[in-house]
Swiss-Prot record:
The keyword Disulfide bond does not apply. SUPFAM superfamilies: L35p-like (SSF143034). The lineage of its organism: Bacteria, Bacillati, Bacillota, Bacilli, Bacillales. One of its GO terms (cellular component) is cytosolic large ribosomal subunit. GO terms for biological process: translation. Belongs to the bacterial ribosomal protein bL35 family. This is Large ribosomal subunit protein bL35. Keywords: Ribonucleoprotein, Ribosomal protein. InterPro entries: Ribosomal_bL35, Ribosomal_bL35-like, Ribosomal_bL35_CS, Ribosomal_bL35_sf. Disulfide bonds: none annotated. Residues 1-26 are annotated as: Disordered. One of its GO terms (molecular function) is structural constituent of ribosome.
């Protein structure tokens, strides 16, 4: 049986926190900033956490990630 490989696209987008949660960046941060309020842009700068519904699926893609 071959080894399970880490999904390289997911590995570039998610990082594990010290407590084992998954950290992610927000979407909507590449362009069209004139249409966004200052408050919205400020909130997008902070990292978010993966939601509970997505956690299991993403964790399987990152199985071998330290």
């Amino acid at each position: 049986m071959p080894k399970q490989k880490t999904h390289r696209g997911a590995a570039k987008r998610f990082k594990k926190t010290g407590s084992g949660k998954l950290k992610r960046d927000h979407a909507y941060t590449s362009h069209l900033f004139a249409n966004k309020s200052t408050k919205a842009k400020r909130k997008l700068r902070k990292a978010g956490l993966v939601s509970a519904g997505d956690y299991k699926r993403i964790r399987q893609m990152l199985d071998n990630l330290k």
